[in-house]
Each structure stands twice: as structure tokens, then as C-alpha cells.
Amino acid sequence: MNLQQLFTMQKELDDFIEQTQNIQQDVFQEKGLALLVELAELANETRCFKFWSTKGPSAREVILEEYVDSIHFILSLGLLKGYTSIEIWPFV
């Protein structure tokens, strides 16, 4: 799967959510916050920051779900900023 496919799929999901939830306002900041929350959830499930703990990470499936949730919001934020191809991203 390439980046263009991911952007296309995310656009379809975003459009569906906006239509079914009647979202008409700019939600960039909310999506930014949602990304931070998902990254925090990912860190919590991997326990990568819990140097004091002896408990291991969550199951791979749980970690993967949080990772994918983060990717969703990265793509969604990119779409709001007009990024649909890695060639036009400013850091490339």
C-alpha cells in the first residue's frame, strides 16, 4: 500500500465521518489533540517510558491498534493542510 492509497482511504473516512456527524467547522486543532492522545495511548500500551516498571507491553494487536489510530490522525491532518503526496511535504 502506498501513501497515495492511504490518503485516499483517509479522505473517504473523513468525508463519511463529517457527513454522518454533520461536522461543518474547522476541526484541525481537535484532530491535533486527538493525535497527541493517540500517541500517548500508544506509549502507554508499549510502556516504553515506564522505566520503573517490570510489567511488559500490551499485546501486539493492542499496540498495533493505537499505532494505526495515530496514522489515521496524521493522514487526516495532512489532508487538511493539503498534503496528499510525500513529494510535496516540506521536509522532503
Give the location of each predicted region.
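Flexible "arm" and connector segments at domain edges
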Residues: 1-92
